[in-house]
């Protein structure tokens, strides 16, 4: 399969939590900056699940009613001539991300947005993405076909390596699908101590029989 390689790249506490009271403290600046610096050394695309995307990159609430009645087919849509040095891939099966721009500024770069959706996303949402010049890939009916998405990301955008930065659920989904090539962990100099916070991987209780 000619697909983009996947590297899970996570910033976590010593006890393996991906967020908490330690995040953003002065003492985590060096390790946090190192994480950001390494991200685009590892690959040209930063990818996240929809929970992370709506929390950080696409916080808007677009009015989709203006797109009612749009005759849009459930097929990939990529603007003609689209080019970027770096990309921001949103795994967003239901179409939740409220983009206000068609890029996400992160790690000193303007990373052009790409949406990976399923047929659960409304046609109004797809019309909204087209109005924003945000390309989208339809990969599945109910659940995302991750392998298909990686093939399309390479074919359409020449993304050779996709860097997956969480959250825990999307990391676990890629692990369960057997699509992770490498794992990169940057550790902050703090212990979270909060058992309610998510760890780096949520595999839904399944052992992943793969050595990294």
Where do the language-model regions lie?
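Enzymes that bind and transform nitrogen-containing heteroaromatic metabolites
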Residues: 1-212
